[in-house]
From Swiss-Prot:
Its main location: cytoplasm. Has three domains with a flexible linker between the domains II and III and assumes an 'L' shape. Domain III is highly mobile and contacts RuvB. NCBIfam families: ruvA (TIGR00084). The gene is ruvA. One of its GO terms (molecular function) is four-way junction helicase activity. The keyword Cytoplasm applies. This is Holliday junction branch migration complex subunit RuvA. It comes from Phytoplasma mali (strain AT). Coiled coil: none annotated.
Length: 186
């Protein structure tokens, strides 16, 4: 329904800001409302969440955080509050790494995330953070992934093998190592 709302923050509370856009005040739930200065204009990437008889806007500074939030909502044990805390962390890359490395201890540091929820997040999202691959992978690994996809390999297998190799080598040597590892999996 909404992609983003751009406007002036006119008020903030414990977990929300009120954004004035063309004389309409939007109540947007955010992780840290005190980050936003009153009477200053911001752009919020928003998710319109409908629950029973409630309609709620969740706001993010960056579209990447919004996309991750939406993916978290697909995890059965994760609700909007927990998803907001995970997706608005200062170090989103570290959350992605924790998911890719099965690190449920790191994920449990977030409020509302227990062992079951952490395991569900890893199970549901590992290898599926497509929008974040530029953060997780360096340029050589991104190039390797494109080559391997063109050769017909499956994305999940590729990501698994790419996480095992040293990215400080030449691209050709990395490709050879990846192909050998993928051949062992066949």
């Amino acid at each position: 329904m909404y992609s983003y709302i751009k406007g002036k923050v006119v008020n903030n509370g414990q977990n929300f800001v009120i954004v004035d856009n063309n004389n309409i005040g939007y109540h947007i739930i955010v992780s840290n409302p005190y980050f936003y200065e009153i009477n200053k204009e911001y752009k919020f990437f928003v998710h319109f969440h409908i629950k029973e008889n409630l309609q709620i806007l969740y706001g993010f500074n960056d579209n990447k955080n919004l996309l991750f939030f939406k993916k978290l909502l697909d995890v059965p044990t994760i609700g909007p509050k927990s998803a907001l805390m995970l997706s608005e962390t200062d170090n989103l890359e570290q959350v992605f790494q924790a998911i890719e490395n099965n690190d449920n201890v790191y994920l449990r540091k977030f409020p509302g995330i227990g062992i079951k929820s952490a395991q569900q997040i890893i199970l549901k999202l590992k290898g599926d953070l497509i929008f974040s691959e530029k953060i997780i992978l360096n340029p050589k690994k991104t190039e390797l992934e494109k080559i391997l996809l063109n050769l017909g390999f499956v994305k999940k297998e590729i990501k698994s093998v790419l996480n095992q190799i040293d990215d400080k080598k030449e691209l050709e040597l990395m490709l050879k190592e990846v192909l050998l590892k993928l051949a062992k999996n066949i």
